[in-house]
């Protein structure tokens, strides 16, 4: 009996010692890791009906608290889309561009000292949040290879930047941003599932398309701006300014003589400098929340098909604005209604972009969200329409929380309208989707 008791005491002591030895060091306690894995499937409904996405996506992010004032964050994302092995529908340039991806989504040093917060590294800087559009969200370039269908946190392309916020007084803060990371919007290649409609040029001469400039670090072309924010009596108001190169290419034309053959028309993608001045506003009038954004872009350029225009580009300063109202019906149906306009300071005749329907282009968006069975079954419907020409996007989705870590999502993306409109250009790209997500 004594031997058994001694053995039990020895085992308890060894277990206790082992537990003490297994105690993680302090630096491990300060580290937080999380991530997700997703399988994304999409099937195109129109002829030729076929699988359009078989993507396996992984995301891993971590945060390390050096101290109460200093922290480090990092996140990586990668994917492999097996649709390029399952079908030969897409050309080689699209496969190279979209089959695989591995990117650093965040690498951020955050320092807080008194009224000053500094964020240095690769990051997303969000100055505005709208439904299916961007008004004052101008700092980060966007990835449009899947149009605007992914979540906006996935659409934004992170940039290397210095971002600091200084609290001037209670309720008033100043944020400054500077970046040498002059990245452009990432556009789908010709032949991609969501390639944009081609500009409707009608040249009689041969045409040469020059490649776009590569993304680069450049002190001479660096970008920056500021946001001044005020919070008073429930009013959240911000004034923003940003100086940048146009994130989307503008195709300038020039005629090159090559006698005795006909002249060649050269289309040269450029990124002219623009200045954005904007304002955001938010206020809760219980039970209604009102939000508004406006951005005036100076020196904005657009392509034109006017045969008398020598370089094929015109300047049109542009005002983008929106007003939205959020309200919950019956204490369970979250409703967001948004009206937005793009207003050109000049004629829209001969302009060719699908997002410009007239001198004043008006859009209406409606998003409905609710939940059933303790929010384990969550339907969402998003409807966006261009009021000028009646093109629209309809995206219903149902998210089912299988467990605390696993979500199953079923949805669709439906488009309709004339071909040279924002949503009508994808009227043959209607699809149904199925996504399984595991978070850890």
Where do the protein language model's features map onto the residues?
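Repeated loop/turn-to-beta-strand initiation elements of outer-membrane beta-barrel proteins
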Residues: 31, 69-72, 115-118, 171-174, ...
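Detector for outer-membrane/organellar transmembrane beta-barrel domains
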Residues: 242, 282-305, 310-384
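Outer-membrane beta-barrel "beta-signal"
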Residues: 144, 368, 406, 414, ...
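Residues that define the transmembrane beta-barrel architecture of outer-membrane proteins
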Residues: 50-56, 100-105, 156-160, 220-224, ...
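Residues on the lipid-exposed face of transmembrane beta-strands in outer-membrane beta-barrel proteins
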Residues: 39, 58-64, 74, 106-113, ...
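Transmembrane beta-strands of outer-membrane beta-barrel pores
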Residues: 39-45, 78-82, 113-115, 124-126, ...
């Amino acid at each position: 009996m004594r031997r058994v008791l001694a053995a039990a005491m020895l085992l308890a002591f060894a277990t206790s010692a082992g537990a003490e030895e297994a105690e993680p060091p302090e630096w491990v306690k300060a580290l937080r890791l999380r991530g997700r894995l997703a399988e994304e499937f999409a099937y195109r409904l129109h002829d030729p009906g076929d699988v359009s996405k078989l993507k396996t996506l992984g995301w891993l992010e971590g945060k390390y608290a050096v101290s109460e004032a200093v922290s480090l964050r990092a996140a990586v994302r990668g994917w492999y889309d097996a649709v390029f092995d399952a079908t030969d529908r897409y050309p080689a340039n699209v496969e190279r561009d979209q089959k695989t991806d591995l990117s650093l989504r965040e690498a951020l040093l955050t320092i807080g000292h008194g009224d000053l917060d500094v964020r240095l590294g690769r990051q997303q800087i969000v100055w505005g949040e709208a439904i299916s559009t961007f008004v004052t969200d101008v700092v980060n370039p966007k990835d449009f290879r899947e149009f605007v269908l992914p979540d906006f946190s996935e659409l934004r392309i992170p940039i290397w930047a210095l971002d600091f916020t200084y609290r001037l007084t209670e309720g008033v803060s100043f944020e400054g941003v500077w970046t040498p990371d002059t990245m452009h919007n990432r556009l789908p290649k010709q032949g991609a599932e969501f390639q944009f409609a081609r500009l409707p040029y009608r040249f009689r001469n041969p045409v040469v398309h020059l490649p776009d400039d590569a993304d680069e670090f450049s002190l001479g072309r660096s970008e920056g701006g500021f946001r001044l924010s005020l919070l008073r009596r429930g009013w959240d108001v911000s004034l923003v300014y940003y100086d940048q190169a146009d994130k989307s290419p503008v195709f300038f034309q020039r005629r090159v003589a090559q006698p005795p053959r006909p002249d060649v028309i050269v289309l040269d993608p450029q990124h002219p400098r623009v200045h954005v001045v904007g304002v955001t506003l938010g206020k809760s009038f219980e039970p209604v929340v009102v939000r508004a954004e406006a951005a005036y872009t100076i020196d904005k350029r657009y392509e034109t098909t006017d045969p008398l225009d020598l370089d094929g580009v015109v300047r049109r300063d542009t005002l983008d604005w929106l007003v939205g109202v959020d309200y919950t019906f019956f204490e369970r149906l979250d409703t967001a209604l948004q009206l937005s306009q793009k207003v050109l300071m000049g004629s829209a005749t001969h302009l060719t972009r699908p997002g410009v329907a007239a001198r004043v282009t008006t859009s209406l968006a409606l998003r409905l969200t609710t939940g059933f069975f303790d929010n384990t079954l969550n339907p969402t419907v998003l409807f966006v329409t261009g009021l000028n020409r009646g093109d629209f996007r309809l995206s219903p989705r149902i998210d089912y929380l299988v467990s605390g870590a696993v979500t199953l999502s079923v949805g669709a993306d439906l488009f309709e309208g004339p071909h040279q409109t924002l949503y009508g250009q994808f009227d043959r790209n209607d699809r149904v989707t199925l996504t399984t997500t595991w978070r850890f």
